Regions:
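Soluble catalytic regions of membrane-associated enzymes that act on cell-envelope
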Residues: 99, 105, 111, 115-117, ...
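Terminal amphipathic alpha-helical/low-complexity segments used for targeting or macromolecular assembly
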Residues: 1-96, 184-333, 421-452
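Conserved short histidine dyad/triad with adjacent acidic residue
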Residues: 83, 87, 101-106, 132-133, ...
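Transmembrane helix-bundle signature of multi-pass membrane transporters/permeases
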Residues: 30, 109, 176, 263-264, ...
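Residue-level signal for short amphipathic helical patches enriched in basic/charged
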Residues: 95, 113, 160, 331, ...
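Glycine-rich hexapeptide-repeat left-handed beta-helix
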Residues: 119, 123-229, 270, 360-452
Length: 452
């Protein structure tokens, strides 16, 4: 684009080209993002050709198509994050081939579109899986899955292929759908067990039946998610220009040596912009409740797009387990003590998180300070006291507290409102007392457990 004048020196040429690319970066960002959407759409549609229900060899055409579809849509959650958890998401899922009803809310769901049916008013939360395949003895089982009207699938919840979640039902966080369900039932855990549930009452105009003015307002806020897309592209151009400038004034070796410094600077910029966006769009977050069709939800989603689309690729993922991530999370509002080890940036509402001295949050953990049942976001604090440990890929729900020196094992779920006593060991989904690694039973009382 726009080649420099022949008499310009190498460094001047880099500067001129970079300036022109930065000026065009909004257009470049739009074309880049739409191209990615088109590639994902065409790929998934082509992969769906010939997929049929039944058992297929893992090493077969259908087996490869199903596997590849899930891999593409898993990657799309990162590459196309701004269009998820938006008014456009149901349309996107329909374009991919899923049967999606009206007034559906969907976040970063991974699904096999040609085998998915979602009823009117259903809610698919973050990182859910629908119509996922199962493997057994070298065979892959592929079957349709259905989410009934006004049913809810919580964060990392699953509705595997061949199963139906009946209308007005709920699958809790990190839980799976049982083989048989009845309408109006709630399920928790893996394997799932029945869960008592307190329904949240709210104005229908703020949950299921919003007026046109609220739909327009939400759309306007969601358009602001284009800002982090533009900043991501602009930062990429700036990094490329900086490396080109190093080559122009020195050699490739200089660019190789100082390239890390350039990337560190880019990461700092991305983190700083994300902190600024959080403070501008939502400010300090406090415990409470907010219906789906309210500006807090929309503003929070804009700020979260900065976190996932700008800070994550440029800073947060690479900074896992370093003091830099702790500084970033403190700037986002978290209270983190001395010597804390934090490998996960998934503290959705950091203002509501307290990590004591020497606390540990392992890789892949979610310190979940909100729940979204009945289209109302409930926010509450989560506390890990001094020396407490949350094992890899575990989730802790709002109003929970891990006592001093308490350990929660990998892949576990700490339920809402649970208080785990100091010096105890816990494991499971949901957690239960865990035998210590030295063979002694965990000395623990059963925690109090709130209804979902």
């Amino acid at each position: 684009w726009w080649p420099p004048a022949p008499e310009a020196g190498p460094l001047a040429a880099v500067g001129t080209t970079a300036a022109r690319l930065l000026a065009a970066s909004p257009l470049v960002a739009g074309v880049w993002f739409l191209t990615q959407m088109l590639l994902v759409l065409v790929t998934v549609r082509l992969l769906a050709l010939g997929i049929t229900e039944g058992h297929h060899p893992v090493r077969s055409r259908v087996g490869w198509q199903v596997w590849a579809t899930e891999r593409v849509l898993d990657a799309a959650r990162d590459q196309l994050f701004p269009i998820y958890a938006s008014r456009f998401t149901p349309t996107w899922l329909r374009l991919l081939g899923a049967e999606v009803g009206r007034s559906v809310e969907a976040s970063t769901v991974v699904l096999l579109p040609c085998m998915t049916r979602v009823g009117d008013g259903a809610f698919l939360a973050d990182d859910t899986m629908v119509s996922s395949y199962s493997l057994d003895g070298g065979w892959m089982h592929v079957a349709p899955a259905k989410v009934g009207k006004r049913s809810f699938v919580g964060n990392s919840g699953m509705v595997p292929g061949g199963r139906t979640l009946r209308r007005d039902s709920l699958v809790a966080v990190l839980s799976t759908t049982p083989a048989k369900t009845k309408a109006g039932t709630s399920w928790m855990g893996s394997p799932p067990v029945r869960l008592r549930r307190n329904e949240v009452t709210a104005d229908a105009a703020l949950t299921y039946d919003p007026p046109a003015r609220l739909k327009a307002a939400r759309t306007a806020w969601e358009l602001l998610r284009a800002i982090p897309v533009w900043l991501h592209v602009a930062l990429s151009i700036a990094v490329g220009a900086a490396l080109a400038a190093l080559i122009a004034v020195g050699t490739w070796a200089l660019a190789f040596v100082l390239g890390g410094v350039v990337l560190l600077a880019a990461g700092a910029v991305a983190a700083g912009l994300t902190v600024l966006a959080k403070r501008v769009f939502v400010g300090r977050i406090r415990a409470g409740e907010h219906p789906l069709w309210s500006s807090f939800i929309w503003r929070n989603e804009v700020a979260d797009t900065f976190t996932e689309f700008l800070a994550a690729p440029w800073f947060s993922r690479a900074a896992a387990g370093t003091p830099a991530l702790v500084w970033f999370l403190r700037a986002m509002g978290a209270r983190i003590g001395h010597g804390a080890w934090v490998e996960s940036y998934w503290l959705p509402e950091a203002d509501l998180v307290e990590l004591g001295d020497g606390a540990t949050v392992n890789r892949g953990c979610v310190v979940q300070t909100h729940l979204f049942h009945d289209r109302v976001m409930s926010l509450d604090a989560v506390v890990l006291e001094d020396g407490a440990t949350l094992g890899p890929h575990s989730v802790v729900l709002p109003a929970a507290r891990l006592g001093r020196g308490t350990t929660v094992g990998a892949g576990s779920l700490v339920m809402r409102g649970e208080e785990l006593p100091a010096g105890t060991w816990w494991l499971g989904n949901p957690v239960s007392p865990w035998r210590r690694p030295d063979g002694d039973p965990a000395a623990a009382a059963t925690p109090s457990r709130e209804e979902a």
